[in-house]
């Protein structure tokens, strides 16, 4: 059994995916070769063994990725975090964090003026037109308050990920 923090497990999954992509690439590069000439095989035993080794590595990495992702998921749905006196699962906090970041980004994009989005324009036949967001001050205050919540939740998740331990039976480590 291997013990890892959630942070280490997430990092390991990322590394395993990179290694998996390298194994996939071998099938497009070094394993994609002429295999027969005039109906006679020209594959050497060494390359055939390399292909078998790659397939074995792929299976081991697949196992480890699934095992780690399942263990992280389990810890996220059972691990608890306290925010403003209320208790939430890490999974709930992660989901709210994802949604709140999306809200902040979308509202910021829609309240920003600049390139191709001028606040003041001269419109022929109308005059000087000023554009803005209705209740802009309220929207900007909402964004600012939500950013504070997002940052606080992010720090709690970082702490959770760096202190919570999972155990997993891994084949590649």
Where are these regions (language model features)?
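Structural preference for solvent-exposed beta-strand-turn elements
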Residues: 1-173
């Amino acid at each position: 059994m291997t013990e890892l923090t959630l942070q280490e497990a997430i990092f390991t999954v990322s590394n395993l995916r990179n290694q998996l992509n390298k194994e996939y690439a071998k099938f497009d590069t070094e394993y994609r070769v002429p295999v027969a000439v005039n109906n006679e095989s020209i594959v050497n035993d060494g390359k055939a063994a390399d292909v078998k080794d790659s397939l074995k590595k792929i299976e081991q990495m697949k196992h480890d990725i699934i095992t780690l992702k399942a263990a992280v998921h389990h810890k996220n749905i059972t691990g608890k975090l306290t925010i403003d006196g209320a208790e939430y699962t890490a999974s709930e906090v992660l989901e709210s964090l994802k949604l709140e970041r999306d809200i902040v980004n979308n509202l910021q994009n829609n309240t920003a003026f600049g390139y191709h989005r001028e606040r003041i324009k001269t419109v022929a036949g109308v005059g000087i037109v000023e554009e803005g967001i209705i209740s802009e001050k309220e929207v900007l205050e909402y964004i600012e308050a939500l950013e504070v919540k997002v940052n606080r939740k992010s720090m709690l998740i970082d702490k959770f990920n760096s202190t919570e331990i999972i155990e997993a039976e891994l084949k590649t480590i």
